Amino acid sequence: MRLSPVCYSFSRSRTIVLAGVLAVVSAGGTIGCTDVSGSSTSVLSIQFDTLPSPSVVVGDTLRDTTGAVIRPVVHAFNFKGAEILPTPVFFLSPDSGITVDSVTGIVVGDSLRSSPARIVATVGRLQAIQKVNLTLRPDTIFAKNAFDSLVYSISDTTKDVSPMLTVMLRHGVAPNDSAVPFYIVSFTIVSQPDPLLGELVNDGGTAAHVDTTDATGIAGRKIRLHPLHLSSATQVDSIVVNATARSHGAVVKGSPVRLVLLFKPPS
C-alpha cells in the first residue's frame, strides 16, 4: 500500500513521524514535505530560513542591518533527515508590493501594502513560504520617551523592570513626514554603575537588544535592574542607553539617541 504525501508545519524544532510520513521541521523557518519514498539523494523536505530583516524598503532591495543584500536561504533534507544539495530553487511572489528574482530570490520593494508579501521557494514539487513587510526609508530617528525612572525593590524583583524607553523612526521631513514601521532598531547600554546591574529586556522580560518598530514607527526596550549589584540599598544613579537605526549600513540621522533611566529606592 502506498501512503499519500502529507505535510505538517510546527513552530518548535522537532521531527515528526506520522502514518509513514516524516516531516523534518526546524525552528526559524517554514517547510514543505512529501512522502518517504526515494533514495538518500531525493529531497523529502525543504526549509526556508527566516529572513534577517522583517521588512524591505520601498524602492530598495531587502537588506540586513549591515546594508548587505539578503539572499534567501533554503535547505533540503532527505528521508534520513540529513541535509543534501537541492535541485535548483526557484522563487516567486504571488503578491503585489515586491518583485522577486526567480533564481537568486533577491527581493525588491516597489509599493506599500497593508499586509506582508509572500515569498515562495520551490524545489521540485515542494514549496515553503516566508513573508516580508513593506516600509519606507528611515530618514530620522529621535527620542519618544528619552527619560524615565524606576523605584527599585530589594525584596520584590517583579518591581525591578523599568518603563519602556522609546524612539521613533520617521520618513521625510515634518510636517509631511510618515512613520517607518517594521524596522529594526538596536539598543545598547553605554553607561551604568556596575556592568551587571542593568540589562535590556523586551515586554516579556527576556533579554533583547533589538526591537522592530510598530505601526506608528516606535521601538523601545525596558531595563531590568539586578539589586544584587547595587552598591547599597539606598543607591541613586542612572543607566544610559543608546538607540541606533541603520540604512544601507550607515547610521540614520539622529543616531545614536540617548535614553536615560534614573533608579532610586522607595522614599
Mark where each language-model region is.
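Bacterial N-terminal signal peptides that target proteins for export
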Residues: 2-20
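An extracellular/luminal cadherin ectodomain-centered signature
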Residues: 44-48, 90-91, 107, 187
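Append "Rare intracellular matches occur via the same short Y/T/C beta-strand/loop motifs
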Residues: 115-122
